[in-house]
Amino acid sequence: MLMRAATFISSLLLSTALATANPCEAEILRAAHKYDVPPGILYSVGLTETGVKGSLQPYALNIEGKAVFARTAKEAATEFAKAQERGARLIDLGCMQINHHYHGDRFGSLAEMLDPRRNVDYAARFLAQLKQRHGTWSMAVARYHAGPDNDPAQKRYLCRVIANMVATGFGEWTRQARSFCHS
């Protein structure tokens, strides 16, 4: 497990240095370090939010529960505008699927929300705040996706993130986690 995590981190550093990394993944280590969030947690949250074939999608949108994978920021902005014209209110944006309705006012523009650096940075800061508020990374992850009154959604989400952590070598199924997620 540690070897896979070390390999991932090494490859991220190498690809970041070569400027060939996925723009979302290139920001994971920087933001994780800045806000003291375990990189495996931040990466696994990203995979849970926008992971396609093991890679985070920088211009992904979730419009009222429907995933849209735009190829560019411009295309994502167009999809966002069309969704708003149709009356959509709950729209998640970017690498880490930041919800525009609840968090959009913390960005200067839609372009900032879609910027991988700002998107991942905000997600890491938000997770750190949730951890401080709720005491554990498990609760922070659960609340990242669903509000305090939605225990079933929190459980499903947390278990998906744990599964991604295990799949990428950043964690193992503990007896407690297995019991919690498979009950």
Q: Predicted segment positions?
A:
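Bacterial N-terminal signal peptides
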Residues: A6-A17
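Catalytic glycan-binding domains that act on GlcNAc-containing polysaccharides
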Residues: N22-S183
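Positively charged n-region of N-terminal signal peptides that target proteins for export
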Residues: M1-A5
